[in-house]
C-alpha cells in the first residue's frame, strides 16, 4: 500500500515538473508586479499588461496562485492568477514592500493613501 502511494506521488511529481515554469521570479506578499497575459478574443490573440499588488499567495506546487489587487476608477479589482499557467508570458517585480502579514486582505477596507505599503530596500 505504501509503495503504491509513493509510486503514484513520484509519477505526479514528474508530470508536474514537466509543466512548471522555471523563469518565475520569487514573489512575496506586498510586491507590486507587472504581468503580461495572453488574451484570446474570438480568433485573435493579444497580450494585455496587468499590474497590481500581491495580497495573497496559495502554494500548491503546479497550481500555485496569487491574488493581485489594483484600484481601477475608484473600484478595487482583484484577480486570481495561476503562476504556472501558459497564458502568463512574463512577470516582473516593480517594487517590493515590507509587510508583516501573510494575507493583506485588510487593504480591501482602506482607500487612498492608507493603502500604501512601506518599500523594502535591498
Swiss-Prot record:
A single GO molecular function term of this UniProt record: structural constituent of ribosome
UniProtKB keywords: Chloroplast, Plastid, Ribonucleoprotein, Ribosomal protein
Principal localisation: plastid
A single cellular component GO annotation: chloroplast
PROSITE patterns for the chain: RIBOSOMAL_L19 (PS01015)
Compartments it resides in: Plastid, Chloroplast
Listed GO biological process terms: translation
Family per record: Belongs to the bacterial ribosomal protein bL19 family.
Protein name as it appears in the record: Large ribosomal subunit protein bL19c
Organism: Gracilaria tenuistipitata var. liui (Red alga)
Amino acid at each position: 500500500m505504501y509503495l503504491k502511494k509513493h509510486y503514484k506521488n513520484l509519477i505526479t511529481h514528474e508530470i508536474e515538473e514537466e509543466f512548471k515554469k522555471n523563469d518565475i521570479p520569487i514573489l512575496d506578499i506586498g510586491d507590486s508586479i507587472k504581468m503580461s497575459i495572453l488574451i484570446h478574443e474570438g480568433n485573435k490573440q493579444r497580450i494585455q499588461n496587468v499590474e497590481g499588488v500581491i495580497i495573497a499567495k496559495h502554494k500548491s506546487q503546479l497550481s500555485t496562485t496569487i491574488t493581485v489587487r489594483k484600484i481601477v476608477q475608484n473600484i478595487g479589482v482583484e484577480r486570481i492568477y495561476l503562476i504556472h499557467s501558459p497564458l502568463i508570458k512574463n512577470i516582473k517585480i516593480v517594487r517590493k514592500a515590507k509587510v508583516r502579514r501573510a494575507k493583506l486582505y485588510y487593504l480591501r477596507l482602506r482607500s487612498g493613501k492608507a493603502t500604501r505599503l512601506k518599500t523594502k530596500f535591498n
